[in-house]
Amino acid sequence: MALDGIRMPDGCYADGTWELKMHVTDLNRDVSLRVTGEIHIGGVMLKLVEKLDVKKDWSDHALWWEKKKTWLLKTHWTLDKYGIQADARLLFTPQHKLLRLQLPNMKHMRVKVNFSDRVFKAVSDICKTFNIRHPEELSLLRKPRDPKKKKKKLEDAEEETLELEGPLLTPGSGSIYSSPGLYSKTMTPTYDSRDGSPLSPTSAWFGDSPLSEGNPSILAVSQPITSPDILVKMYKPQSLLDKAKINQGWLDSSRSLMEQDVKENEVLLLRFKYHSFFDLNPKYDAIRVNQLYEQAKWAILLEEIECTEEEMMMFAALQYHINKLSIMSSDNHMNNSEKEVDEVDAALSDLEITLEGGKTSNTLGDITSIPELADYVKVFKPKKLTLKGYKQYWCTFKDITISCYKSREEAHGTPAHQMNLRGCEVTPDVNISGQKFNIKLLIPVADGMNEIWLRCDTEKQYAQWMAACRLASKGKTMADSSYNLEVQNILSFLKMQHMNPDPQIIEPITTDINPECLVSPRYLKKYKNKQPGFVRDLISARILEAHQNVAQMSLIEAKMRFIQAWQSLPEFGITHFLAKFQGGKKDELIGITYNRLIRMDAGTGDAIKTWRFSNMKQWNVNWEIKMVTVEFADEPSLAFICAEVDCKVVHEFIGGYIFLSTRAKDQNESLDEEMFYKLTSGWV
């Protein structure tokens, strides 16, 4: 027997070679190669392809090490360097595989995605396919399982699928994502800013993508919910704990799909993960605006975010208006390609949604003095075992401080109460029909938060004081350029909720309004309990009343207003996770927003303590005990253990928001992918 044929106990042959077992997924075939540890990965693949002797383009294939869950992408590395021995089993498989993506509009699309790219890069490629700017705001989420549905097949069968396949996304496009107009101010408008339809042929922005063979503009068009049964069947979180469980499903942006056990043809949800929408511009972002609108719409209908009855009717009226205009737009656009949009552009210039909620005013104003507010305001300090209500004070709002005096005449003396609003939580409590305009303040103190309520008499007073409170919570004064726009946005939000029916202009109730599809099940049930026999007519009448306030809006303006109103809700932008705080005895919630961390009561959702990112020095993770520690400039450190969720998800949210806060319109047009990994991965 030849020496090279003698096999040793460790599986190696006497000549130093050994058998490497591989499975070729495309052919469903097992192959063994005699190799040494000194052969590099590229050489292994070359030998394998030669042995297979199958004429095929193998350029997209790579080796995957099942046991270690690792792609062997460094083709110049040897087997020894990777630590691969005779007991290893490798897969020779395509890097690009099909995924079924559920978009924010709940439609499903088949897209080929690179399973070897990090998720952050894969999402960038997906967004490039769909012409969605600022892909850093989105990510992939595993579908939450409805505990009421035990059979997965039954759940999958209920999904409405839109079978449009995206283009083949090729690897090797570079580590820095760049697309025309990521931050550019000199882009050519791609969409009509009145209705969001493409100004150029679809092939110009989807290229030779199979999407252009179908109907790509469907991504920019809102499709109405056709049956209330769809709402009934969909999973609705019943509590804050349910919402926290949904957030366990976010994928790790620093690892590939394959490393996270994502299978070919699996359903993943593409969602706006970070609620910080940068440079939202209807001229270039019709698809982005529509998908944002859809995510907001479904969040409200599935009760993922709380709103009042008046707000629900306002959202329903906007939906009804958008549904009507979407149908009209698709019918009329071919005959109206040239439109006068100057007035729409002017109106929309005030609607651009940025991190701070506004943009610089054209007027400089008086830069030598900081505006102040002074008025009679009712103040209430809730305490246990007290029945005392609101007490009226003469209040002055200077810089970021509210001072309360017993009367206007005493305003030059010592205030009875004084509140510094930096870092406070500001929550609206408004009922238009009841003329209730309250502002709830949770003001940080050494041992938690002090609760103070302000009651205003009019919408104008409320808008001015609420805008000032929101700015002060961020450490900004009324001299900030965004103050006046914030006041106008609040007044606009209130105006849309007015119910002043004029019989002359209210539309007759028609059968196509489908009110059951425009309001959440909770409010539908509430109306059923009130007047069981007339639910449909009652809700339709309320929606048509509210519709008067939005009936003159263009399609894209209505969507932008919907997004803006969604942003105005108290719970907007808070991502919840179950956590146990150091020194605490029970599970609580940690809420993460674009600018702060919130310790919350798991039962009620009330804020217990708030920490601003602007005051944060650094944060660290102890991966063994799943503890996140955050250090601040002038207050004690925060430490909590993540419960039921990988602390990497929480760590990534904090780092992700820090990363997004560094964006600026005047920076270059590329996205610093490596900086994102440094802030979010935890081990780069």
From Swiss-Prot:
Residues 378-474 form the PH domain. A 1,2-diacyl-sn-glycero-3-phospho-(1D-myo-inositol-3,4,5-trisphosphate) binds at K381. Its main location: cytoplasm. InterPro entries: Band_41_domain (IPR019749), FERM_2 (IPR035963), FERM_central (IPR019748), Kindlin/fermitin (IPR037843), Kindlin_2_N (IPR040790), PH-like_dom_sf (IPR011993), PH_domain (IPR001849), PH_Kindlin/fermitin (IPR037837). Residues 40-81 are annotated as: Interaction with membranes containing phosphatidylinositol phosphate. It is found in: Cytoplasm; Cytoplasm, Cell cortex; Cytoplasm, Cytoskeleton; Cytoplasm, Cytoskeleton, Stress fiber. GO terms for biological process: angiogenesis; cardiac muscle tissue morphogenesis; cell migration; cell-matrix adhesion; cytoskeleton organization; integrin-mediated signaling pathway; regulation of cell shape; Wnt signaling pathway. GO terms for molecular function: integrin binding; lipid binding. It is a peripheral membrane protein. Disruption phenotype: Morpholino knockdown results in severe defects in embryonic development. Nearly all embryos display pericardial edema. Most embryos display abnormal body shape and size, defects in heart morphogenesis, impaired mobility, and die at about 7 dpf. The embryonic cardiac muscle and skeletal muscle show defects in the association of the actin-myosin myofibers with the myocyte membrane. Likewise, morpholino knockdown results in defective angiogenesis, with abnormally short and thin vessels and very little blood flow. Keywords: Cell adhesion, Cell junction, Cell membrane, Cell projection, Cell shape, Cytoplasm, Cytoskeleton, Lipid-binding, Membrane, Nucleus, Wnt signaling pathway. Residues 279-577 form the FERM domain. PROSITE patterns: PH_DOMAIN. Residues 141-163 are annotated as: Disordered. It comes from the Eukaryota. GO terms for cellular component: cell cortex; cell surface; focal adhesion; I band; intercalated disc; lamellipodium membrane; nucleus; stress fiber. The keyword Hydrolase does not apply. Scaffolding protein that enhances integrin activation mediated by TLN1 and/or TLN2, but activates integrins only weakly by itself. Binds to membranes enriched in phosphoinositides. Enhances integrin-mediated cell adhesion onto the extracellular matrix and cell spreading; this requires both its ability to interact with integrins and with phospholipid membranes. Required for the assembly of focal adhesions. Participates in the connection between extracellular matrix adhesion sites and the actin cytoskeleton and also in the orchestration of actin assembly and cell shape modulation. The FERM domain is not correctly detected by PROSITE or Pfam techniques because it contains the insertion of a PH domain. The PH domain binds phospholipids. Binds preferentially phosphatidylinositol-3,4,5-trisphosphate, and has lower affinity for phosphatidylinositol-4,5-bisphosphate. Belongs to the kindlin family. This is Fermitin family homolog 2. It comes from Danio rerio. The lineage of its organism: Eukaryota, Metazoa, Chordata, Craniata, Vertebrata. The gene is fermt2.
